[in-house]
Structure formats: C-alpha cells, structure tokens
C-alpha cells in the first residue's frame, strides 16, 4: 500500500534535514574539504546515491540553509495579504531567521565559509539568486513589471543589503548578533522605502489609481 502524499513529503523532509545536519556536524568536526559524500552518507545512515536525490552537490548541502531561507521567503511573499508591504516582510524575515545562524553549529559553518574565498563568493551568488523571488513582489508593490528599471533598481539594492550582511559577517570573528543585524539593515530599508515611494510618485496618475 502506498503512503499518503503528506506522509511521504514529511519523510522526505526528515531525510533531507538528517543529511544536512550530519554533513554540517562533519564539516565542523573534520573540515569542509576533508569531508566526503560517503562520510556524510554513513553519518546520516543513507546510501550515497540517496544524497543526490536531495542535494546535487556537497556545496548544496553546505548552503542548505540558504535554500531553505529562499523557499521560506518565497512562501512569505506569495502568501502576503493585500496591502502588506514586501519590504517589511523581507526585513522581518531577515531578523527572524538569525536564530539558526547564531547557534553553535551555525557559527562554525559561518567560520568555514569565512575562511574560504571560493565559498564566500558562492554565498554571494546564492544570495543574488533571491532576486528571482523578490522582484515579482517589488513589481507588484510598484504596479510595474519585473523588467521595469525601477523594480530592478529596488531589487538590486535589496540584494546589496543582503550581501552587506554577508560581508560584515565575514569581517567578524563570530556571527553577527541580532542587534548588529538590525543596526545594519534598518538604514538599508529606510533608503529602500524612500526610493520605493519616490518611484511610486513618478508613476502616471492613472496607474497609481489602478494599483491603489
């Protein structure tokens, strides 16, 4: 008898989390480069081929929290109520997702990435991929399209804010505290809100009425 879809999905999620947790523990214990996929499979009690059903590469396991964050942010933006501000949703999301980053394992993963320039560059690239989910929400707030210059400018500035956090985090010996994160991002979002309102004011009056 086949399992209900909900049960199958929960089992898959538990397996994915077990693989990521085992890998992160090994990365901290042995180092990222010294840890192999068979090592991870053995620690997670799965076959090596099973790992590829969840993660295309070892890098994807290391950055699994970024993927999880991206999915959660996409969900938060897609489920927002009419009138909810996309920028405030993103700001709240950034602050609320820092607990994992400041856990003991999270801080050690931070150190691993910080010590490797290639991994730091990959972190920036993965952050930049969030443009795909942020741009539609910004476009909706502006009443424009995702390829509109104003939408692209606000989205790129928001991604720059994410990368500012990553760069400041890399410059510290330990992870940024929630207070430091708030102090960094609040000026970014003040700037973005002002820019967003200025772009709204430049829209033709008819379009403003249609999107109000």
What are the residue ranges of the model-derived segments?
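Hydrophobic alpha-helical connector segments
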Residues: 71-111
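C-terminal peripheral helix-coil segments that are non-catalytic and often amphipathic
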Residues: 2, 136, 171-212
């Amino acid at each position: 008898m086949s399992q209900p879809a909900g049960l199958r999905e929960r089992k898959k999620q538990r397996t994915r989390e077990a693989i990521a947790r085992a890998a992160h523990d090994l990365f901290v214990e042995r180092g990222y480069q010294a840890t192999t996929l068979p090592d991870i499979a053995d620690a997670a009690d799965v076959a090596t081929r099973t790992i590829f059903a969840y993660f295309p590469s070892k890098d994807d396991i290391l950055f699994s929290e970024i993927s999880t964050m991206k999915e959660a942010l996409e969900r938060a933006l897609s489920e927002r109520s009419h009138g909810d501000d996309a920028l405030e949703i993103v700001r709240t999301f950034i602050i609320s997702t820092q607990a994992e980053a400041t856990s003991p394992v999270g801080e050690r993963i931070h150190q691993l990435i910080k010590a490797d320039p290639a991994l730091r560059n990959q972190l920036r690239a993965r952050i930049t991929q969030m443009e795909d989910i942020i741009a539609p929400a910004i476009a909706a707030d502006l009443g424009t399209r995702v390829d509109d210059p104003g939408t692209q400018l606000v989205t790129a500035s928001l991604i720059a804010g994410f990368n500012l956090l990553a760069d400041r985090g890399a410059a510290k010996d330990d992870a940024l505290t929630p207070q430091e994160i708030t102090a960094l991002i609040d000026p970014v979002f003040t700037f973005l809100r002002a820019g967003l309102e200025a772009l709204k004011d430049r829209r033709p009056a008819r379009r403003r009425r249609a999107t109000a």
